[in-house]
Amino acid sequence: MNEIVLSEEFIIWLYALKNIQARKKILQRIERAKDGNFGDYKQLADNLFEMRIFVGSGYRVYYTKQGNILYLLLTGGDKSSQSKDIERALKMLEEMEK
């Protein structure tokens, strides 16, 4: 079982979502990720991954793996803000690795 750690930024983003169905689906995906089932995801950089949730406007959750057991959810967004969200996730990852 994986340990999931949520960044403060991710928590704020998640609970600010107006689409309750999307929030529910994202939380379900996080629960499945605890068991190692990340569903539809894509590796974006060496240690940055994008979990894709196909509901509403197409939500994305950006995360990194630290070791074999700890997963950190960095930030989230939808398809319209994808480029900006990836830049933000990379910046957060860089800060974590210092």
Per-region residue spans from a language model:
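Solvent-exposed, charged helical/coil patches
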Residues: 1-31
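Amphipathic alpha-helical interaction segments
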Residues: 18-21, 49, 70-71
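A short, surface-exposed loop/turn module that caps and links secondary-structure elements
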Residues: 28-55
